[in-house]
Amino acid sequence: MSRGLGDVYKRQRLIRAWGFTYKSVAFVWLKKNKKAASWFYGLGFWTRANAEVCLLATKGHPKRQAADIHQFIISPIEAHSKKPDETRDKIVALMGDRPRVELFARQTPPGWDVWGNEVEPTAGLWSRWPEDSGKEDVSCPM
């Protein structure tokens, strides 16, 4: 699950609602411009946004397979909202070649189950957003 830094709390609630256990901010993607060596800056309400985070959540008790995986990914932006392929490569190195799902996916990479409104879902999750059991709305970070 990847998105800007805002609403991490709501995303953690959504992770729990789907039966996963939140583990960590696995990766922080620092975005570079496509054609220049400078940083990419998007829009933002308080500050001009650059970083996106990838949250790691699990089911069961998988073991970490590698201890040399670094959190930062510095990579240029690509097509709208496309994440660097390095992100998925690092997840496989970290967790091993096991079943895995990308939530809010925008493409269907080989070897991955996906779920989102821009892909044909292959993961056995809800066909719609899970209901919130609390008083706050659960927003789905797209």
Segments and roles (model prediction):
Residues 10-142:
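Class I S-adenosyl-L-methionine
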